[in-house]
C-alpha cells in the first residue's frame, strides 16, 4: 500500500477548494440571474394586476387615474437577494400636506384651547411642511396578511416640503446636481473616466480640468461649481451619458403606467355607446328622408297653357 506524502494532501485540498469555489460562484451567478429574470420588465404589465398577486388588499386602493407605476429592485442584507417593490404615481393626487401644512399630531389639548386665563402660547411651526413618506420599498412576500419585519428604512424617511413651487424646483435641481457630482467623483476615483479624444494635449487638459473640478468640490462643497461645468466634464470624459443612464435605470424592472392603459370593460361600454349613437343617427336620417319626400299621387296639377 503506497503512502501519500503531506504535500500530495495539500495539493488535493487546494484543488478541491478551487473546484468548490468555482462551483459556488457558478451557483451564485445562476441564482442571481434567476432573480434578475423575474423582474425583467421594461414598461410591461398592468400595475393593478401585478400588485394583485403581491398584495391584494393594496391593489384595491390603486386608481388608474393616478398614473400608477410599479418598480421592482433586488436588495437585502444577505444572499440570495429579496425582491422589493414600490408604487409610484405620475399624476397629481390630493395631498393633505399641500393644502394644510400644519402638524396635526401636535395640536394643543382641548382644555388648553379654552383656557382664557393664561396668555396665548406662541404657535410652534417647526413641524410644518414636513411629511413622512410611508410608501417605501417593501419586500415581495406571499404572507401579505402579516406585517413584514424586513422593512427598509426608507419608508419612514422624513422629507421637507416647501410651500413655494420655485423653491421645490430649486431643491430638485440641486439634488440632480449632487447626483451628477457623486457619479463623476466615483468614476474618477475608480479610474472609469475615459476621454473621447485621442489627442495627447487634449487629454492632458481634460485630466487637469477634471482634477481641478474634483478639488473645488472637495474644498468648497457642491455650491462651488455650476451644473453646466459638471455636464461639460462628463461630456468630455465619458462616453456614457448620465441622463440616458438615469432614464434607462428608471425603466428597468418597471411596469407600464396605468395612465396609458384602458380598462376592457370601459372600452366595451364606449364601443356600445358609439354603436348606439351611430344607429340612432342612421335611423334618424332614414326617417327624415322618408317624411321629407315629395308625393304627388293624389295632388291635382293644373296643366300649363
From Swiss-Prot:
It comes from the Eukaryota. It is found in: Cytoplasm, Cytosol; Mitochondrion outer membrane. Its main location: cytoplasm. Keywords: Cytoplasm, Membrane, Mitochondrion, Mitochondrion outer membrane. GO terms for biological process: negative regulation of mitochondrial fission; negative regulation of protein targeting to mitochondrion. Transmembrane segments: none annotated. One of its GO terms (cellular component) is mitochondrial outer membrane. PANTHER family: NADH DEHYDROGENASE (UBIQUINONE) 1 BETA SUBCOMPLEX, 4, PROTEIN MFI. Acts as an inhibitor of mitochondrial fission. Interacts with MFF and prevents DNM1L recruitment to mitochondria, promoting a more fused mitochondrial network. Can homodimerize. Interacts with MFF; the interaction inhibits MFF interaction with DNM1L. This is Protein MFI. The lineage of its organism: Eukaryota, Metazoa, Chordata, Craniata, Vertebrata.
